[in-house]
UniProtKB/Swiss-Prot annotation:
Oligomeric and partner information: Interacts with tail assembly protein Gp24 and tape measure protein.
Biological processes, Gene Ontology terms: viral tail assembly; viral translational frameshifting
Record organism: Mycobacterium phage D29
InterPro entries: Gp24/Gp25
Protein's name in the database: Tail assembly protein Gp25
Biological role stated in the UniProt entry: Promotes tail assembly by creating a scaffold for the tail tube proteins. The tail assembly proteins Gp24 and Gp25 would wrap the linear tape measure protein to create a tail assembly scaffold. It would allow polymerization of tail tube protein during which Gp24 and Gp25 are released and therefore are absent from the mature virion. The tail assembly protein Gp25 is produced by a rare -1 ribosomal frameshift. The ratio Gp24/Gp25 is important for proper tail assembly.
Disulfide bonds, paired cysteine numbers: none
Basic and acidic residues bias locations: 236-245
Keyword set, alphabetical order: Viral release from host cell, Viral tail assembly
Pfam families per the UniProt record, alphabetical: GP24_25
Organism domain of life: Viruses
């Protein structure tokens, strides 16, 4: 994976950490644009969707005869979409939008809207914020636990008003969390996977191989008058547990219990017959 940090990147991280995204409208009026991670989940989703909508607007072919009309139409559409974002992230959205709308030329106005949006995206690390927000929404508890256990980092510091952790820094830590931790276990399906890395699976395979070898040895040297030794069971793996363990009280659980009782009864009868 590409290294996220360079010396220049560290320098920018330190500088930006203390600088809010502030847009000056006049000498005495400023508007702050909140980072994505400080929005509620629904607001975050709406912002991400709006940004994606802007990015998906196709380029205009300058050779197209209708290009002039399309440019104005696209410009108005861009302003409309970006205004939705400003209403969610700006502390004074009406003043910001009114200031931008003072420009009469729709093309220049659209460029102004887009420039403010791009500035916010860069300064707040939107890409990393979006990825991190999605992970926190799905696996927040596990990430909180792992960051504290492995790095001594409190995830809540990401949301502090003063000296917050940067999204890029936290995302980098999350990406490189150990595979044996709670985060990767949750991504794979649940905490039953915790601790199960390549080494654990290899040990389970070795255990099964040794048990199988012992069983073959017992079968080759057994007394034919005595019952056959039971075949060894495979070492339980989280994948098997997830597939074969039905919910207590469910119909599947009752079927499993009935089959187990019938099998045990049959084994007792065979043992008594011999």
């Amino acid at each position: 994976m590409t290294n996220v940090f360079t010396i220049d990147a560290f320098r920018e991280e330190v500088k930006k950490k203390y600088e809010p995204v502030t847009i000056g409208i006049s000498e005495d009026v400023t508007v702050e644009l909140k980072p994505l991670l400080k929005l509620g989940q629904k607001a975050r989703e709406a912002v991400v969707e709006a940004v994606k909508e802007v990015e998906d607007i196709p380029d205009i072919d300058e050779d197209d005869e209708e290009a002039e009309e399309l440019v104005d139409e696209y410009s108005l559409r861009i302003c409309e979409i970006v205004a939705k974002v400003f209403r969610l992230i700006a502390t004074k959205p009406k003043k910001l939008i009114a200031a931008l709308d003072e420009e009469e030329d729709p093309r220049i106005r659209a460029e102004l809207y887009a420039t403010v949006l791009r500035t916010w995206m860069v300064e707040t690390q939107l890409g990393e914020s979006r990825a991190l927000a999605e992970l926190i929404d799905k696996f927040g508890g596990a990430i909180l636990s792992d960051l504290s256990e492995y790095h001594g980092v409190d995830l809540r510091d990401l949301f502090r008003d003063e000296d917050p952790l940067s999204p890029r820094y936290v995302l980098n830590l999350v990406i490189h969390l150990p595979k044996t931790g709670a985060f990767y276990a949750e991504r794979r399906g649940g905490q039953q996977y915790r601790g199960w890395d390549e080494d654990r699976y290899a040990l389970a395979d070795i255990y099964d191989a040794v048990q199988a070898g012992n069983h073959i040895l017992l079968m080759a040297n057994r007394d034919p008058k005595k019952p056959k030794p039971k075949a060894p069971k495979a070492y339980p793996r989280p994948d098997d547990f997830e597939k074969t363990t039905p919910k207590p009280g469910s119909f599947a659980a009752m079927v499993v219990a009935a089959k187990k009782a019938a099998r045990e009864k049959r084994e007792r009868e065979e043992a008594n017959a011999e």
